[in-house]
Amino acid sequence: MAQAHLAGSKKNARREGRLIVFVDESGLSERPTRVRTWAVKGETPVVQFHFNWHQLSLIAGMHFNGVCFRLHDGTIAKEQVVAFLKALLAHWRRPLLILWDNLQAHRSRMVRDYVASTGGRIKLHFLPGYAPDLNPVEFLWAWLKRHALANYCPDTFAELRHSARGKLKSAQRRSIIIASCWQQAELF
């Protein structure tokens, strides 16, 4: 059902020469994503970390053969969403069909006004509720947290920011990661 919901948007995007870009947000903190690991027999692995509520927010847009991302301290609000849409237009230099969830910032007046000011260069489509598996960017976040930064314990927030940026830049260069995100979403 949800895939049929997106089929019309996909056909129209191709007819209009638009890039289909999925957008999503996520967050990281100095508290690690703990995953199963190996250790010497008889020695329990210990993950020591700083308990801190400071959050690094991530926003990414993914096209079939590329990803564009930004990092922000704190939460992502409508201002950051508009700035990111501007960055996407500058990055891909083509009309865009943005597919994203129903986050309040995505539906804000500021975002709607900006999209209207682009002269049709951006069209928005909202994904069905409770369907994160339709967004390939969700699988990028899973890779980042469960593989690239799994059990990672930064000493400072700046170190977390540096590592997250480095791992996301690595994902940009590795087409196999982007392809696997699309494959897991089972959309195209």
Provide a role label for each language-model segment.
Residues 1-188:
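Short functional hotspots at interaction and active-site rims
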